[in-house]
Amino acid sequence: PHVLQLSTHEHAWVFQLHDPECRAVAADLLSRQGMAKAGFGLGDDRKRIIEKLGVEPAEILELNAVFRAQGYRKDMGVKGAVAVLFNQRFQKSKKAATSNWASERLSESQLVYAANDAYAAYRVWDALGL
């Protein structure tokens, strides 16, 4: 991955992993015990994190698996989860989604996209009471 985004209720962080300082902080956060990290579509990311950051991610929760365990048959992404849990539509910019995430400097729209994505996953995790 080129970018790692994390969120709490109050703050969101977007780490560009080409930057050595960002990589070091991201590696520390991802490998830290006692801190849950949750998201959607994390299967491939785990392998790439190990390769790129040299750490084994700890306490990672694939939210799609939670929905599957609750009986949902189809994959549940963040948009579907927001619809199910909050009865709201979560819009994601196709332009930002398909933009160059390896860029030296992310645009404001990319930062907003990444932060919103992380915050939405946090809200889903929180609403599920996990």
Predicted segments, located by residue:
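Short arginine-rich
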Residues: L130
